[in-house]
Curated annotation (Swiss-Prot):
Name of the protein: Angiopoietin-1 receptor
Biological source species: Mus musculus (Mouse)
Main location, first listed in the record: membrane
Primary gene name: Tek
One cellular component term from this protein's GO annotations in UniProt: perinuclear region of cytoplasm
Modification Phosphotyrosine, positions: Y858, Y990, Y1100, Y1106
UniProt entry tagged with the keyword Lipid biosynthesis: no
Subcellular location field: Cell membrane; Cell junction; Cell junction, Focal adhesion; Cytoplasm, Cytoskeleton
Length: 1122
C-alpha cells in the first residue's frame, strides 16, 4: 500500500513538472562552445512567455566543482524581450572553461538547462557536447585525441576520477564503455592528460532517461508518442521535445529556415542564420546544432542528402522531391509526410480565431473559449490555456464545427491576481501556435457595513439599507436584502429605496440581515456584506431567570431557576425541553407548575451530554431561554490522562502537561511524584481541582535526582487506574544557587559585627533544616507551591527581589550610572505610576541619548516591585538587537532610575497611526495612490523583528505578558524592539495573584479565565499585535466592551480579517488564536513563515489606495479601559 501511495505521489509530482515545463519555452544558446581567441557567449531565452521571476545564468557547480568562482556579468539581451546574456571578450578566454546553466521559474518550479564550454586547444575533444540515451542502453562515451603527450590519460565524472589509461596505451579515440546505462551514470565526463588541468580538459555530458526506449510515466509503462526528426520523448510527460527548427506534437512540422522555438517565432539574426550556435533544451534533450548544421562548433553545413540537427537525418524523398538541409523533403502539392510518401490534403499549421485582445470579467466562475482552425483540426488534448502564473488548463468542454475546433475552459474562481496575459495554445502534428490575450478581473462589490435596524416590532423591522461605502468595483446595478431567522435558510428581496420595512416576521425571534450588491456583467453579484443581528419584540412572557443546570447523579440532572412573578392573571407553567446530544431521537418536554423553582430530570443515561432550555407559558407560548448543557455523572472510573509530557526540566523544576477525555465527569487531576528508590508512602500529591488546566510546574525538586511521576484523573466514582510511571531526572545544581555566599558577605559588610551573629544563627538554622529535610519533604514541597513574593530591595549596584524560597537568589548586579552623568531633557512618556524622560548620559566615557524610566511618588508597592523586576529581567536577558537593551541604572534618594536605549521613532502603535497618510496628508495620499507611508515589506519587517525578539525571550524562558504595539519601540534604521518588561516573568508558567489593570484585548483565553500566562499566551498576544500592524494601528475588537470579549472569545469569536490583508497573513493570526495553547505555533515557526513571505516579495499587506478605502477603527477609550 505504501509503495502504491508513493507511486501516486511520484506521478503527481511528475505531472506538475510537465505542466510547468510546458508553460515556459526556455532555450539556452551556446555560441562557440570551443573557446579560442574569439568572442563567445551564452544567451538564455524565455520564448513567447512573460515570466514573473527573472531568468538567470550561472555556473553549474553541481556538475563541475573545481571551476572558476568569479561571478558572471549577466546582462539583458537588447535584441529580445525576455532574454539574458553573458559575453566573454577575447582577453577573458582563460576564465571561460566550465559548466553553466540557464534557469527559469514558473509557479515556484524551476526549469534548468545545462551546457559547457572548453578550450579548442584541449588535449582531447568530445565526439558530442551532450549524449542522450535510454535506461539500459549500452553507451560508449568517446574523446578524440588531439595532442600527443607521453603521459597517462585520465577520465573524470563530475570532477571525480574514474579511469586512467597508461601513456603507451592511449588510443586515438579514448572511450568509456557503460553497459546497461542507469540514471546514476548520468553526469559530466571529462578527459585530459594526468599532467593537465581544467583548461586542457574536454567535457561531454551524458543524459540517461529514467525509462527504457519509447517508454514514459512514473513506472515507465506508458508508450511514447513517436517523435519525428530526432525529437526526444520526455520520460515525465510523454511529450516530444522538438529539436531547434521543428515544431508540433510529433516534431514533424519544419520551421522556416533560421527560425526556432516551440512556435518557430524566434529567429537567428546573423548573416549566416544559426551557424556557430549550439542550442540547448531542457533534459532529456540536451544540446545540438540547429537544423542544417553540424560539428562541435555547429559551423559545418549538412552534406547533400542530409538535414536536421547535427545533420543526423537522411532524406529519402519520393517522387524526386528536393531535399533541403533545413527542412528535409519539400513536398509538391498533394503530397505530404517526411519522405512525401503520402498523398492527400496538405497539413496546415493551426491558427487561433476570434480571440479578442482584452476581456473584462467579474471575479468568480469564468469560462474562456479558444477557437482554432488548421488541418487536421486540433483535438481536445491539443488545446490548452495558460494562466499568468503558468498554470496550464485543459478544456472542460469541446466540440467541432465545419472549420474550427472550439475548446471551452472552466476556472471555478477567477480573482484580481489572475488579471494579466493569458495564452491560448494549440499544438498539433501540423505545428504549434500561441495567442496571448489580456484579462482584467473586476472585484465584485461588497458592503463594508451591515444594514442598520431603525425600529422593530413583534412582526416587522424598519431597515436602513445603504450600499455606501462598499469594497470592490462599481457601478452598483442592484441591491438584495437577505434575511433569515437564526439557524434557518436565507430569503431575499430586491430593494431600491434606502429605507425599507420588512414585514411578516416571527415574534421574539433572532434574525440576521445582510445586503448583496451587484455590478454589470455576467456573475456580477458580489458576496453578501457584514451581518446585522436583531430580535423582534415578544408577545409572550420572558424565559425564567437564573437558570442553572447541574449533574445530580449518574442518571439525573437538576435544573433550577429564580421564582417567577408575572402581572398576568392567567395561570402559567414552565415548559422544560430536554434533548440528548448523543442520541438525536431522545427528546422530552416536561411541564412544571409555575410556583416551583426546580425540576429533576431523571431516567437519563450515564456519561451523556444533554441540552436543556425552558420557557414560561400561559395561553400563549413564552420565549425560549438560551440552551444549557451538562453531562450526567460517570458510571465508571475515568480513563488515564493522555499525551503526558515532561518538559523544561531544570535543577529544581519541571513542566508536566496532559490531556483528558470529555464525558467522564472529571473533577480534578492528581500529580503524584516521589524520588526513585524511596518507599511508596514517601510520595508527594498535588491535587488540581480545575480539570480544564492541562499543565503544571513541579517545583522544589532536588538537583540531579530521578523521580517517578504518575498522573491520575478523579471523578465521582474514584481515581483512574494507574498506568506506567513517567521518569524525570532533574539537572545538576545551577551555579546561580551555589553563589549565595556573595549576598551574605554583602549583608555582613552592611550590618557589621551584628551581622556576624545573624550569620551564625542562620547557619545553625540551615544545618537543622538539612537534617530534618528528609522527614518534611512533602510539607516543604506544598509550601513551595504557595509562596508569595515580598517587597523589593535594592542597593547601589545590586538588585534583590527577595522571595520566600528555599534558597534566595543572588542580588542582580546591574551597570551603575553616576547621578551627575545624567542630563535630563524632555518628558517623552507618562503613565499612571511612571514616567519616561529623554536624557543625555555618559557611559564608559561616551555621551549618548537614553530613555530614563522612573516611578512616581505615589506608586504602589506592587508597582515598585514590577519596576525593579523590569531591571532584573533586562539584566538577565542580555543584549539582543530586537529588544530595548539596558544601558545602566542609578539609585538616587531612594528612587531607582532605569536607563535604556532611546528609540527616536517612538512606539510602534503611534508610528503606525502616523503612517495613515489619507488622514494626515490627503493630497499626498491621492497623488501617490497610497493609504500609508509604509510598504508591505516594512510592515512585515516590523512583524519579523518582534517575532525574532520574542523567540529570544522564549529561549530565555521569559514570559512578556503585555505584548502589544504600544510596547514595541521603533529604533534606528526602523528596527522594532520589544520594550516594557515590567510584567515579564522568568518561568514557563506564571499565575497572576494580584489584581490590577489588564490588557484584556491582547490576552489569551487561558489568561482571561485562569490568570495563567505562558509563552503560548504571548503567542496569542503576538497575533493581536500582527493584526495591529496590518490594520495600521487599529484598535482590536473596536466597538466591543471587555465584558463582551469575556463572553464571545470562548465561543470561537476572533478578530476579523483586515480588508488589506492577504489570506496567508490572516491564517498566521488565526493560528496564534487557537483555543488550545499547545496548538499555537512557536515564535521560531512564526519567524520562519514571515521570513518566507519577505523572501517572496509578494504584497501581503495592501497599502494601495483603492476606491472607498477606510482605515480600521481606533477607540482610545477602549484601549485605556483594557
Amino acid at each position: 500500500m505504501d509503495s502504491l501511495a508513493g507511486l501516486v505521489l511520484c506521478g503527481v509530482s511528475l505531472l506538475l513538472y510537465g505542466v510547468v515545463e510546458g508553460a515556459m519555452d526556455l532555450i539556452l544558446i551556446n555560441s562557440l562552445p570551443l573557446v579560442s581567441d574569439a568572442e563567445t557567449s551564452l544567451t538564455c531565452i524565455a520564448s513567447g512567455w512573460h515570466p514573473h521571476e527573472p531568468i538567470t545564468i550561472g555556473r553549474d557547480f553541481e556538475a563541475l566543482m573545481n571551476q572558476h568562482q568569479d561571478p558572471l556579468e549577466v546582462t539583458q539581451d537588447v535584441t529580445r524581450e525576455w532574454a539574458k546574456k553573458v559575453v566573454w571578450k577575447r582577453e577573458k578566454a582563460s576564465k571561460i572553461n566550465g559548466a553553466y546553466f540557464c534557469e527559469g521559474r514558473v509557479r515556484g518550479q524551476a526549469i534548468r538547462i545545462r551546457t559547457m564550454k572548453m578550450r579548442q586547444q584541449a588535449s582531447f575533444l568530445p565526439a558530442t557536447l551532450t549524449m542522450t540515451v535510454d535506461r539500459g542502453d549500452n553507451v560508449n562515451i568517446s574523446f578524440k585525441k588531439v595532442l600527443i603527450k607521453e603521459e597517462d590519460a585520465v577520465i573524470y565524472k563530475n570532477g571525480s576520477f574514474i579511469h586512467s589509461v597508461p601513456r603507451h596505451e592511449v588510443p586515438d579515440i579514448l572511450e568509456v564503455h557503460l553497459p546497461h546505462a542507469q540514471p546514476q551514470d548520468a553526469g559530466v565526463y571529462s578527459a585530459r592528460y594526468i599532467g593537465g588541468n581544467l583548461f586542457t580538459s574536454a567535457f561531454t555530458r551524458l543524459i540517461v532517461r529514467r525509462c527504457e526506449a519509447q517508454k514514459w510515466g512514473p513506472d515507465c509503462s506508458r508508450p511514447c508518442t513517436t517523435c519525428k526528426n530526432n525529437g526526444v520523448c520526455h520520460e515525465d510527460t510523454g511529450e516530444c521535445i522538438c529539436p531547434p527548427g521543428f515544431m508540433g506534437r510529433t516534431c514533424e512540422k519544419a520551421c522556416e529556415p533560421h527560425t526556432f522555438g516551440r512556435t518557430c517565432k524566434e529567429r537567428c539574426s546573423g548573416p549566416e542564420g544559426c551557424k556557430s550556435y549550439v542550442f540547448c533544451l531542457p533534459d532529456p534533450y540536451g544540446c545540438s546544432c540547429a537544423t542544417g548544421w553540424r560539428g562541435l562548433q555547429c559551423n559545418e553545413a549538412c552534406p547533400s542528402g542530409y538535414y536536421g540537427p547535427d545533420c543526423k537525418l537522411r532524406c529519402h524523398c519520393t517522387n524526386e522531391e528536393i531535399c533541403d538541409r533545413f527542412q528535409g523533403c519539400l513536398c509538391s502539392q498533394g503530397w505530404q509526410g517526411l519522405q512525401c510518401e503520402k498523398e492527400g490534403r496538405p497539413r496546415m499549421t493551426p491558427q487561433i480565431e476570434d480571440l479578442p485582445d482584452h476581456i473584462e470579467v467579474n471575479s468568480g466562475k469564468f469560462n474562456p473559449i479558444c477557437k482554432a482552425s488548421g488541418w487536421p483540426l486540433p483535438t481536445s488534448e491539443e488545446m490548452t490555456l495558460v494562466k499568468p502564473d503558468g498554470t496550464v488548463l485543459q478544456p472542460n468542454d469541446f466540440n467541432y464545427t465545419d472549420r474550427f475546433s472550439v475548446a471551452i475552459f472552466t476556472v471555478n474562481r477567477v480573482l484580481p491576481p489572475d488579471s494579466g496575459v493569458w495564452v491560448c495554445s494549440v499544438n498539433t502534428v501540423a505545428g504549434m501556435v500561441e495567442k496571448p490575450f489580456n484579462i482584467s478581473v473586476k472585484v465584485l462589490p461588497e458592503p463594508l457595513h451591515a444594514p442598520n435596524v431603525i425600529d422593530t416590532g413583534h412582526n416587522f423591522a424598519i431597515i436602513n439599507i445603504s450600499s455606501e461605502p462598499y469594497f470592490g468595483d462599481g457601478p452598483i446595478k442592484s441591491k438584495k436584502l437577505f434575511y433569515k431567522p437564526v439557524n434557518q435558510a436565507w430569503k431575499y428581496i430586491e430593494v431600491t429605496n434606502e429605507i425599507f420595512t420588512l414585514n411578516y416576521l416571527e415574534p421574539r425571534t433572532d434574525y440576521e440581515l445582510c445586503v448583496q450588491l451587484a455590478r454589470p456583467g455576467e456573475g456580477g453579484e458580489g458576496h453578501p456584506g457584514p451581518v446585522r443581528r436583531f430580535t423582534t419584540a415578544s408577545i409572550g412572557l420572558p424565559p425564567p431567570r437564573g437558570l442553572s443546570l447541574l449533574p445530580k447523579s449518574q442518571t439525573a440532572l437538576n435544573l433550577t431557576w429564580q421564582p417567577i412573578f408575572t402581572n398576568s392573571e392567567d395561570e402559567f407553567y414552565v415548559e422544560v425541553e430536554r434533548r440528548s446530544l448523543q442520541t438525536t431521537s431522545d427528546q422530552q418536554n416536561i411541564k412544571v407548575p409555575g410556583n416551583l423553582t426546580s425540576v429533576l430530570l431523571s431516567n437519563l443515561v450515564p456519561r451523556e451530554q444533554y441540552t436543556v432550555r425552558a420557557r414560561v407559558n400561559t395561553k400563549a407560548q413564552g420565549e425560549w431561554s438560551e440552551e444549557l448543557r451538562a453531562w450526567t455523572l460517570s458510571d465508571i472510573l475515568p480513563p488515564q490522562p493522555e499525551n503526558i509530557k515532561i518538559s523544561n526540566i531544570t535543577d529544581s523544576t519541571a513542566m508536566v502537561s496532559w490531556t483528558i477525555v470529555d464525558g467522564y465527569s472529571i473533577s480534578s487531576i492528581i500529580i503524584r511524584y516521589k524520588v526513585q528508590g524511596k518507599n511508596e508512602d514517601q510520595h508527594i500529591d498535588v491535587k488540581i481541582k480545575n480539570a480544564t488546566v492541562t499543565q503544571y510546574q513541579l517545583k522544589g525538586l532536588e538537583p540531579e535526582t530521578t523521580y517517578h511521576v504518575d498522573i491520575f484523573a478523579e471523578n465521582n466514582i474514584g481515581s483512574s487506574n494507574p498506568a506506567f510511571s513517567h521518569e524525570l531526572r532533574t539537572l545538576p545544581h545551577s551555579p546561580a544557587s551555589a553563589d549565595l555566599g556573595g549576598g551574605k558577605m554583602l549583608l555582613i559588610a552592611i550590618l557589621g559585627s551584628a551581622g556576624m551573629t545573624c550569620i551564625t544563627v542562620l547557619l545553625a538554622f540551615l544545618i537543622m533544616l538539612q537534617l530534618k529535610r528528609a522527614n518534611v519533604q512533602r510539607r516543604m514541597a506544598q509550601a513551595f507551591q504557595n509562596r508569595e513574593e515580598p517587597a523589593v530591595q535594592f542597593n547601589s549596584g545590586t538588585l534583590a527581589l527577595n522571595r520566600k524560597a528555599k534558597n534566595n537568589p543572588d542580588p542582580t548586579i546591574y551597570p551603575v550610572l553616576d547621578w551627575n552623568d545624567i542630563k535630563f531633557q524632555d518628558v517623552i512618556g507618562e503613565g499612571n505610576f511612571g514616567q519616561v524622560l529623554k536624557a543625555r548620559i555618559k557611559k564608559d566615557g561616551l555621551r549618548m541619548d537614553a530613555a530614563i524610566k522612573r516611578m512616581k511618588e505615589y506608586a504602589s508597592k506592587d508597582d515598585h516591585r514590577d519596576f525593579a523586576g523590569e531591571l532584573e529581567v533586562l539584566c538577565k536577558l542580555g543584549h539582543h538587537p530586537n529588544i530595548i537593551n539596558l544601558l545602566g541604572a542609578c539609585e538616587h534618594r531612594g528612587y531607582l532610575y532605569l536607563a535604556i536605549e532611546y528609540a527616536p521613532h517612538g512606539n510602534l502603535l503611534d508610528f503606525l497611526r502616523k503612517s495613515r497618510v489619507l488622514e494626515t496628508d490627503p493630497a499626498f495620499a491621492i497623488a501617490n495612490s497610497t493609504a500609508s507611508t509604509l510598504s508591505s515589506q516594512q510592515l512585515l519587517h516590523f512583524a519579523a523583528d518582534v517575532a525574532r525578539g520574542m523567540d529570544y525571550l522564549s529561549q530565555k524562558q521569559f514570559i512578556h505578558r503585555d505584548l502589544a504595539a504600544r510596547n514595541i519601540l521603533v529604533g534606528e534604521n526602523y528596527i522594532a524592539k520589544i520594550a516594557d518588561f515590567g510584567l515579564s516573568r522568568g518561568q514557563e508558567v506564571y499565575v497572576k495573584k494580584t489584581m490590577g489593570r489588564l490588557p484584556v484585548r491582547w490576552m489569551a483565553i487561558e489568561s482571561l479565565n485562569y490568570s495563567v500566562y505562558t509563552t503560548n499566551s504571548d503567542v496569542w498576544s503576538y497575533g493581536v499585535l500582527l493584526w495591529e500592524i496590518v490594520s495600521l494601528g487599529g484598535t482590536p475588537y473596536c466597538g466591543m466592551t471587555c465584558a463582551e470579549l469575556y463572553e464571545k472569545l470562548p465561543q470561537g469569536y476572533r478578530l476579523e480579517k483586515p480588508l488589506n490583508c492577504d489570506d496567508e497573513v490572516y491564517d498566521l493570526m488565526r493560528q496564534c488564536w487557537r483555543e488550545k495553547p499547545y496548538e499555537r505555533p512557536s515564535f521560531a515557526q512564526i519567524l520562519v513563515s514571515l521570513n518566507r513571505m519577505l523572501e517572496e516579495r509578494k504584497t501581503y499587506v495592501n497599502t494601495t489606495l483603492y476606491e472607498k478605502f477606510t482605515y480600521a477603527g481606533i477607540d482610545c477609550s477602549a484601549e485605556e479601559a483594557a
